């Protein structure tokens, strides 16, 4: 059965594309067939894909498509989604006419955030949209907030320390235990060198790989049916 994961944050969201690229690379490494859909007008995902093709670095097991309208997305899902093990969707975030159909098709929505008030509020908006769509359609799409571009300095800020109580206690959604740190390799990948999993393993790459594996393990746990509260315990 095809698993559908979307990255959504109505206020931008740090690292949506990078997060999905890393998750896709991990699933492809396992032997999965992964589709990625670029619905963001900035075309970051599609640019990475074409640049990787030009450098003969396109990863095996991954295909990337571009759809900018809800109709195009829904048609593609009906005709093609079942041919893939995972479908990962990079969204524009703010256009509800696009985001609502994406949520309606998703098993999990990930809202990446940097520790900023704007992005935390965007993640909360995304969670509320998931609840709204679930209620309207009788679905059980899950939602999680992922902290990205983390540094040692960021970890000492007041807002960083407030993220967990805000997200888990006040809002009531899931906060990933895995954090995505600010790493040069994540920037390098966007230059068309394929996925993280294709790179020669150095100490820096090994850290990023461990980080990504931990994230995907959490994703699999959520998709496997464990409640968010249970997994957070």
What are these regions (language model features)?
Residues 36, 89, 111, 145-147:
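Structural beta-sheet core signal
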Residues 123-137:
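Conserved C-terminal guanine-recognition region of P-loop GTPase G domains, centered on the G4
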Residues 151, 163-196:
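Beta-strand-loop-alpha "switch" segments that mediate conformational coupling across diverse proteins
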Residues 4-14, 20-89, 93-97, 191:
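P-loop/Walker-type NTP enzyme "switch/lid" segment
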Residues 186-213:
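Inter-lobe coupling/hinge region of RecA-like P-loop helicase motors
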Residues 98-117:
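Inter-motif core of Ras-like GTPase G domains
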Residues 209-233:
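Charged phosphate-binding loop/patch that engages nucleotide di/tri-phosphates or the phosphate backbone
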């Amino acid at each position: 059965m095809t698993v559908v994961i979307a990255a959504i944050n109505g206020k931008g969201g740090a690292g949506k594309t990078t997060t999905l690229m890393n998750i896709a690379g991990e699933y492809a490494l396992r032997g999965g067939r992964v589709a990625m859909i670029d619905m963001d007008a900035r075309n970051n995902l599609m640019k990475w894909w074409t640049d990787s093709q030009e450098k003969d670095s396109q990863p095996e097991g991954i295909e990337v498509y571009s759809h900018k309208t809800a109709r195009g997305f829904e048609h593609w899902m009906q005709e093609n989604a079942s041919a893939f093990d995972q479908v990962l969707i990079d969204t524009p975030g703010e256009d509800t006419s696009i985001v609502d159909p994406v949520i309606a098709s998703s098993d999990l929505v990930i809202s990446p955030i940097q520790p900023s008030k704007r992005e935390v509020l965007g993640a909360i908006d995304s969670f509320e949209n998931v609840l709204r769509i679930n209620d309207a359609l009788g679905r059980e799409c899950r939602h999680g907030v992922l902290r990205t571009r983390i540094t040692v300095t960021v970890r000492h800020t007041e807002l960083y320390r407030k993220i967990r109580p805000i997200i888990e206690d006040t809002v009531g959604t899931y906060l990933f235990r895995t954090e995505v740190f600010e790493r040069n390799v994540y920037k390098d990948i966007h230059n068309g060198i394929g996925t993280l999993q294709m790179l020669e393993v150095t100490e820096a790459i090994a850290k990023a790989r461990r980080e990504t594996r931990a994230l995907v393990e959490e994703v699999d746990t959520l998709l496997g049916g464990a409640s968010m509260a249970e997994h957070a315990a």
